[in-house]
Amino acid sequence: FSGIGVGYLFSIRTSRDPFMCFSATASFLTAAVTGLSGAAAVSRTTERRELPLAAVPLFFAVQQAIEGALWLTLPVAAQGTTCQALTNSFLFLALIFWPLYAPLAAMAMERDPLRRRLIGACAVVGLGAALYLASVLLDGTHAAIIKDGHLIYDSQPPPSGAVGIFYLIATGLGPALSSHRAVNLLAIIVVLGSVVAYVAYWDAFVSVWCF
């Protein structure tokens, strides 16, 4: 989740910078795989405090399904209300939902008081990032287009790239502070992977991170 959101925030400096994914087939396939894994994780959860984290793949599946629908809708009704609704829904999940949900999911699992407070601080940072990005989405204009085989999101005005740091604190650092090894290892991989993808695959940053 942090790779997708940070990719958007750091890559949209101008309307020409791309935020992309591969195809409808790839998006729907990813949605199916992550949805099934999320359903399995939720069904095997034995404690309520683990449910928010177990449900993460389900939300990601919804996000990928939205992109798949955009791939199918854009060629036939690019200016229609359906495309705009799909675009806004994807950006809501990518930019507003994840910086709130990720640290709260990690905090729900945490039993160590100090770690809970630290993760809670990351959640506050995420709230600030989400509120700022919500204002950007409400005040600006946003469109998805297919160009050169990629799905590109164009926002005017573009959000400040600096907010990407706060987004990464919420979605990456928050889970990394967990006492659960699987959670913080995943967070570390996400953060380091996003840096590597940003440096090595600038033009295709989010194409790399969608999967």
Question: Each predicted region: which residue ranges?
Answer:
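Hydrophobic cores of alpha-helical transmembrane segments in multi-pass inner/ER membrane proteins
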Residues: F28-S37, A94-M107, V163-P175
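Central hydrophobic cores of alpha-helical transmembrane segments
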Residues: A55-F59, L185-V195
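Loop-to-transmembrane alpha-helix initiation sites
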Residues: F205-F211
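Membrane-proximal helix-loop-helix units in multi-pass membrane proteins
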Residues: A105-A170
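Loop-to-helix transition at the N-terminal end of transmembrane alpha-helices
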Residues: R49-Q63
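Internal transmembrane alpha-helix with an interfacial aromatic "cap," most often the third helix
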Residues: G38-V42, G68-C122
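Hydrophobic transmembrane alpha-helical segments in integral membrane proteins
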Residues: S15-T34
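Alpha-helical transmembrane segments in multipass membrane proteins, preferentially the mid-helix core
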Residues: L36-A41, D139, D154-I188
